[in-house]
Each structure stands twice: as C-alpha cells, then as structure tokens.
C-alpha cells in the first residue's frame, strides 16, 4: 500500500504534496486555468522537422515538481516492495528519466550483438490523453485513488487534454503508464530470445540468434515476433513509426539511442569530426555554426562533454577489466587517467609501464603464476608531469584544449583562479557586502547581484584533465600552460596548445583585472 491509497479528499492530496490545503490547487485549476500557464516554443529535431515544447510557468511548475517528487517516491516504494518477493524479479527495462540510468545504460544491454531491431513509438507524449492519465490513477493498484483526486492529478499534469513535453511531471507519469507495456513486451521478447529495453519512445531489441532471411525458419519466427509485437503495441494505445523502424546486423553500424554499439559504446564518428571542426573555427575566427545557425560556446561545451562522458565510461570498463584480470598484460594499459575510479585513491599517473620498462622476474607471483605490478604503481601522489597530456587519447585532448580556450581565451569576463575550492564562496560573500566600493567587480540590481568577474570552477573534470593540485602549487601548474617553455611531448618538442590561441585577448583581461584589484 502506498501513500496514495490512503487519500480521501483534496486536502489530503494537497498535504501529500507539502501544501497546507487545496486552496492553491483550486486557484490554479479553476481561477487561472492551467491551459493559461504554459509557454510554447519549438526546437529542431535531429532528423529534420520541429519538436514542440510546452514549458509550464513557475506557478504551475512548482506544483508539477511537487507531484513529480511524490510520484517518484511511490514508484520507488513499489519497486522496493516487489523486490522483497523472492518469486518476483524486477527487470531493468526503462532507462529514460530515471536516476542512475541514461542512454549509456540503455545501449550497454545491446552491445556486441548480431542483430539489433530499433522501433520508435509515434507521437509518444500525445498518446497520453487526459482520460488515460485519469484512468490509470484510478485503476492502478499502487495508487487506486478516488475519481475526484485522479481528475485533479490529470488537470495538473495535462495541457490541452494530453501530457505536455516539457512539464516536470510528464516523464514519471509516462514511465508509470508504460510500465505494464514493458512487462508485456519483455514476455514476447523472451519467447523469441530477444533482449529488450526502452528509452522513452525508443524500443530496442537485440539478439545473437541467426535471423538470416535465407533461412526460412528464422525468417518466419522474426515475422511472427514482429506481428505479435505490433498487435501488442497497438492494443496498448500506441502507434509504431515505420520510418524509424530498422534492423541492422553486426556487419553494419549498429546504433541504440544515438550511440554506436558494435564492439563498444561509442559516439558516431561524424559527430566527433563536426565538433572538432566547430572548435577549430571558434579558435580561428571566434565564431562557428551549428546547422547553418550561429552556435554558442555553451552548445559546444555540451557536445564535448557528451563525447567525454562516453570516453570516461569506456575508460571505467577498461579499468574494471584490468582489476578483474589482475595481470601484467592488462594492467599495463591501466594508465593514470583511470586512477580516480579506484575507491578513495587519487590519480597515480606517475607510473606508466610497458613491457620494456619492467623486470618480469621481480614481478612474478608464484602463487597465481601471474606478473603483478609493484605496489608503488598504486601510490597516491601528484607531481608536475610534463608528459601528462600524452596520456590522453585524441578526444580527451581536444576537450582539454577547448576548456582551456573557454576559460582563458573565449571568456567574456576576467576569470579568477583561487587557491582552494571554497575560496570563491568567501570572495563572493565579501564582494556582496562591499559592492558599493567595487562597482568594477560587482553591481546590484534590485535584490540580485551581477558579478563582472568569474571564478574557475575546479570540477572533477578540470582536475582530471589538467592535473592541477590544490593550494599555492596549483598556480605554478596553470602558469606552465601559458609558458613557451612547457612541452607536453619533450621528444617531439611540441608546445602546449595555448600558443595556438590569441594570447592578446587573455593578457588584456589579465591587466584589466590587476588594475581593478589594485584600485
């Protein structure tokens, strides 16, 4: 039994959302009307066309967030109660809009398979109309609310009679309603030995079975599977988009939710090349385009971060494999850039091993008949390493170069690098108290403060890519990235990438900052 099963009145429902009474809900639903509380706009789709987004205004968004949080609690409570039943195993089927799940976890299930079948549900959010949402909360045993409360929930969640794409309550409601569809589909998938997962409206099936059309039996089984699947989807109130239905084998490029999954999870090569080309144009001309429209540095940051996220995931898998095998042949590839994955340990890029660097007779483990690396390999320590940049692959190097440009060359405001991570917090607090004395650094408009400077956010990504320690020693590291004497490859005498950027822009901002502080 969940909290929703115990609701009797609107006031009970309001208290469940954290409100004192139902007055605020009634005011939005019947005085203002929820259909008047949306801003609509369009965004371009990847494959052409436009996607309509209906974003709720803050009054309604506040209420929808409350509803979303309570529904998530009920959803997790339901899964937890079922997981205690030994006879019931909760399958991981939906990977969208849930914490700890993503397009990566969705793609991982279908990696390195012979055949992959991609199916798209047409007009996914439009399929959830007012009556369907209301009926679900009445009939579903985890909720089983009264018709009055079910109507209120549907009124809060729906716009123009259906779930809007852009409302914070829509994702969880779609997951709740499609949960029964997932369970029914997975039964059919198991019958024909397919692996199934869903990411919102993207349904993916994969198998290592032979589905060659020349083999009549396999071809007939595939036809039966598709027929049963289509009948189930249509009877559940959805429609298949035939334009996006495709079957691919392992001799072709196989994609799942935009990621390539043939051997390992990867970003499409065209996406990486286009991102690099955009960055090159930005470095050279100070501007670039995305789909023939001017791009922003934040858009490019998102593209690089997405590529980097996939690289980090693959590095993590390599690291796990190395630890599991625990032998010399696999551990020699365990570069320092993966060290942050090792429990509480920090980076240990200090030791890079190759066969020629090791004396195998000293590292032989007689008990397990393996060659283990010395314990010093796992030592925690940071030291200035001029060859550190050579540890990264080309994609990581490009992201590092871009971040350096973004923070020190392409920034609109002077940037301050502090000694510690928490220093910006105290400096900002001091500037807010002294804003009248330093109008060059901060201004106040109404109740809000506008900073004319920025602080470098020492995130895990910055720490990982730049190898800059905390404390005063970190300033020396940042200086090295601007020094003409600093090389990331001593043998080839390749200088650090800052020499490729326009240094005058940074020097001008640096002088401006020092003059302002001295005043």
PLM regions with names:
Residues 70-74, 139, 180, 184, ...:
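Active-site catalytic microenvironments for nucleophilic, acid-base chemistry
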Residues 113-115, 196, 253, 414, ...:
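The start of beta-strands in P-loop NTPase/AAA+ ATPase cores
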Residues 118-123, 166, 170, 192-214:
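Catalytic palm active-site di-aspartate
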Residues 211-223, 463-474:
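Short, flexible/disordered intra-domain loops and linkers
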Residues 339-340, 344-519:
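Acidic, divalent-metal-binding catalytic cores of TOPRIM
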């Amino acid at each position: 039994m969940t909290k929703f099963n115990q609701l009797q009145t609107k006031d009970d429902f309001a208290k469940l959302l954290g409100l004192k009474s139902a007055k605020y809900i009634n005011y939005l639903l019947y005085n203002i009307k929820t259909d008047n509380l949306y801003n609509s706009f369009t965004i371009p789709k990847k494959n052409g066309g436009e996607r309509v987004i209906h974003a709720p205004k803050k009054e309604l968004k506040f209420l929808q967030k409350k509803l979303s949080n309570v529904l998530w609690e009920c959803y997790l409570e339901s899964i937890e109660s079922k997981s205690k039943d030994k006879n019931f195993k909760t399958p991981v089927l939906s990977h969208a809009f849930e914490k700890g799940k993503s397009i990566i976890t969705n793609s991982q299930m279908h990696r390195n398979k012979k055949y992959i079948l991609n199916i798209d549900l047409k007009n996914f959010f439009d399929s959830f109309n007012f009556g369907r949402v209301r009926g679900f909360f009445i009939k579903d045993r985890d909720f089983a609310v009264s018709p009055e409360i079910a109507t209120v929930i549907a009124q809060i969640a729906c716009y123009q009679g259906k779930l809007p794409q852009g409302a914070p309550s829509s994702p969880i409601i779609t997951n709740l309603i499609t949960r029964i569809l997932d369970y029914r589909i997975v039964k059919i998938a198991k019958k024909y030995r397919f692996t199934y997962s869903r990411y919102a409206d993207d349904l993916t099936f994969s198998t290592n079975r032979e589905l060659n059309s020349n083999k009549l039996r396999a071809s007939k089984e595939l036809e039966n599977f598709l027929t049963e699947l289509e009948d189930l989807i249509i009877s559940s109130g959805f429609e298949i988009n035939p334009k996006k239905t495709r079957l691919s084998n392992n001799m072709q490029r196989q994609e799942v939710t935009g990621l390539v999954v043939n051997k390992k999870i990867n970003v499409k090569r065209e996406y990486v090349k286009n991102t690099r080309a955009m960055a090159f144009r930005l470095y050279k001309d100070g501007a670039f385009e995305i789909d023939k429209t001017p791009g922003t540095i934040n858009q490019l940051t998102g593209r690089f971060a997405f590529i980097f996220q996939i690289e980090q995931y693959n590095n993590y898998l390599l690291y796990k494999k190395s630890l599991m095998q625990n032998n010399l042949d696999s551990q020699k590839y365990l570069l320092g850039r993966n060290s942050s994955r090792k429990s509480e340990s920090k980076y240990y890029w200090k030791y890079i091993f190759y066969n020629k660097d090791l004396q195998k007779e000293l590292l032989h483990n007689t008990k397990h008949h393996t060659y283990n690396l010395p314990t010093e390999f796992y030592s925690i320590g940071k030291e200035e390493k001029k060859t550190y940049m050579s540890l990264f692959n080309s994609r990581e190097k490009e992201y590092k170069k871009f971040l350096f440009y973004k923070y020190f060359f392409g920034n609109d405001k002077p940037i301050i690098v502090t000694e510690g991570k928490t220093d910006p917090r105290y400096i900002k607090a001091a500037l807010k108290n002294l804003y009248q004395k330093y109008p060059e650094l901060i201004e106040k408009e109404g109740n809000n403060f506008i900073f004319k400077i920025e602080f470098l956010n020492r995130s895990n990504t910055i720490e990982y890519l730049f190898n800059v320690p905390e404390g005063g020693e970190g300033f020396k590291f940042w200086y090295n990235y601007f020094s003409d004497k600093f090389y990331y490859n001593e043998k080839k005498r390749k200088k650090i990438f800052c020499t490729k950027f326009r240094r005058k822009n940074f020097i001008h901002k640096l002088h401006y900052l020092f003059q302002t502080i001295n005043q």
